[in-house]
Design a protein with these regions (language model features):
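Hydrophobic transmembrane alpha-helices that form the core helical bundles
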Residues: 108-146, 325-345
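Juxtamembrane transmembrane-helix boundary signature
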Residues: 2, 69-103, 112-127, 288, ...
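C-terminal membrane-solvent junction of multi-pass transporters and transport-like membrane proteins
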Residues: 392-465, 469-471
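Hydrophobic alpha-helical segments and their helix-loop junctions in multi-pass secondary transporters
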Residues: 131-135, 187-220, 235, 242, ...
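Membrane-water interface regions at transmembrane-helix termini and the short interhelical loops
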Residues: 57-59, 86, 102, 110, ...
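Membrane-interface loop-to-helix entry segments
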Residues: 157, 161-202, 208-212, 267-270, ...
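Transmembrane alpha-helical segments of multi-pass small-molecule transport proteins
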Residues: 39, 140-172, 186-195, 231-250, ...
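Membrane-interface "cap" regions at the ends of multi-pass membrane proteins
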Residues: 1-64, 221-235, 254-262, 465-471
Length: 471
């Protein structure tokens, strides 16, 4: 055994095999095959059963949906490949440890707390999705689009049991999360495809024009929803995972990649999940909207419920129930794993398994409240807007620190616990564009990229100014 191998084994043992506070060693790097299942599984998953129908409630047209998703998902793949994966293989650090080097311990603690909690809310929405399938044999009342609170004891019991299983899987670490996705994702992808085909038959589609006319020129949004245009679809689908790519959260995943080109595997998630699966789920909801139950809601001026379990069950029976359960798991598993890493940075004395169980418990509590799933379009937009600008700090420092003449990883080198350059860059960009969104009723996803750019530029400017003062 070489000294290099001995050192790698020592690192792995001290880190519990997750390498939270050191670069991933060469012997632990993984090929593209280890990532494609995770991304296909995570993005052809529980969120898709919610997002597809929610596009219909927003009154999208056929062109807006089909072409808008094509472009928006391409922008997401390019962001992962040329930003996230590129930086990840250079540094091989988690997002949280990388930010600590730049921001300082105190500042990054606040970020990690917000990041972990938001991840838990997202995972909770996926537990909600799985619960709508598990509850079918028990004749459980399904949550409505406007529901916020648990609707009964059966709902609570099912959510708690699902949350416990998901948390245990996530707590076993990246290897288990990746393997779970590898096993589940082919089944889920096949289920989405089958649901789409069956729904087309139920809708009487026999030609492309029939398919196009399902959405046609669009419609008025359902009560309580906003109208989605072409640009809403493009920008929202680009930043649906903004915290993961331009926000750099997936540094924690791609640090295990052998090469940056592994970032291209995210296309499996975007075009199998955020394209085929969203459209298939929208077709399931289109079938439901023709039912007497849905028509009764619409006649009363109310939005029909979006319950993935019954919709999939109506299309492909028990196979649909199983698919929805597994789809929720494959999104919640890696999301809880990421949340655990965020909490690990705040509570470094706790093992990865313990903080992941903590994250899973919070996600389970969130899953009890259907609002996180029913308002998923709005929540995902807010989530990306809050977290993405922090990724700009990493990106702009990585690519422009030499041109800007600033010191890389300044908090680490200057032994700062609070880098005010980062704080003011984020606070100004967040405050300015959130004000614009609220004051002028601008869709939040529209201002995410401008806020990201401004945060990166301000970080370079403030770093140049403050570092010069210190020197």
């Amino acid at each position: 055994m070489t000294q290099y191998s001995i050192n790698e084994d020592a690192i792995a043992e001290s880190s519990g095999g997750e390498f939270e506070r050191e670069p991933v060693p060469q012997s632990k790097l993984k090929s593209w095959k280890c990532f494609i299942g995770m991304y296909a599984g995570e993005h052809a998953a529980g969120t898709e059963f919610m997002i597809g129908p929610l596009f219909l409630t927003a009154g999208v047209s056929a062109f807006d949906l089909i072409v808008g998703l094509l472009i928006g998902n391409l922008l997401a793949v390019l962001s992962w490949r040329f930003l996230t994966a590129e930086i990840a293989v250079k540094n091989r650090l988690t997002l949280y440890f990388q930010l600590e080097k730049i921001c300082g311990k105190k500042l990054v603690t606040g970020y990690n707390l917000a990041n972990g909690i938001l991840f838990c809310f997202l995972a909770g929405a996926m537990i909600t999705v799985s619960a709508t399938a598990v509850g079918i044999p028990f004749d459980m009342p399904m949550p409505k689009l406007t529901d916020t609170m648990p609707n009964g004891a059966t709902w609570i019991i099912i959510v708690v049991l699902i949350g416990a299983v998901i948390s245990i899987i996530a707590a076993r670490g990246y290897e288990t999360v990746s393997k779970a996705a590898d096993w589940m994702s082919p089944f889920i992808v096949l289920a989405f495809l089958a649901c789409g085909i069956v729904a087309l038959s139920q809708l009487g589609v026999t030609s492309f024009s029939d398919f196009w006319n399902i959405w046609g020129e669009g419609s008025d949004p359902f009560p309580g929803q906003i109208k989605f245009t072409f640009w809403h679809v493009v920008i929202w689908s680009w930043f649906a995972n903004g915290a993961m790519h331009v926000g750099m959260s997936d540094l924690s995943v791609f640090r295990f990649a052998k090469r940056a080109r592994v970032g291209w595997v995210t296309a499996a998630g975007m075009y199998v999940g955020h394209y085929m699966a969203w459209i298939a789920a929208a077709l399931l909801y289109a079938v439901y909207l023709k039912s007497p139950e849905a028509q009764a809601f619409l006649s009363l001026g109310e939005a029909p419920p979006v319950a993935p379990g019954p919709m999939a069950h109506n299309a492909i029976g028990v196979f649909g129930i199983i698919a929805v359960v597994l789809a929720g798991w494959t999104t919640a598993n890696p999301t809880i794993y990421r949340a655990g890493l965020a909490f690990q940075a705040i509570l470094p004395k706790l093992s990865t398994a313990k903080v992941t169980i903590l994250a899973g418990s919070l996600a389970t509590i969130a899953g009890l409240f259907p609002a996180f799933a029913m308002k998923l379009l709005d929540f995902v937009a807010l989530y990306g807007f809050i977290l993405a600008p922090f990724g700009a700090v990493i990106v702009f420092e990585h690519f422009f620190h030499k041109k800007a003449g600033i010191i890389k990883n300044y908090a680490e080198s200057a032994k700062l616990s609070f880098n005010k350059s980062v704080f003011w860059a984020w606070a100004i960009s967040f405050g300015l564009f959130y004000f614009i969104s609220v004051q002028f009723d601008v869709f939040l996803s529209f201002v995410t990229f401008p806020a990201w750019i401004l945060c990166g530029v301000l970080f370079l400017v403030f770093s140049k100014l403050f570092q010069k003062q210190v020197q």
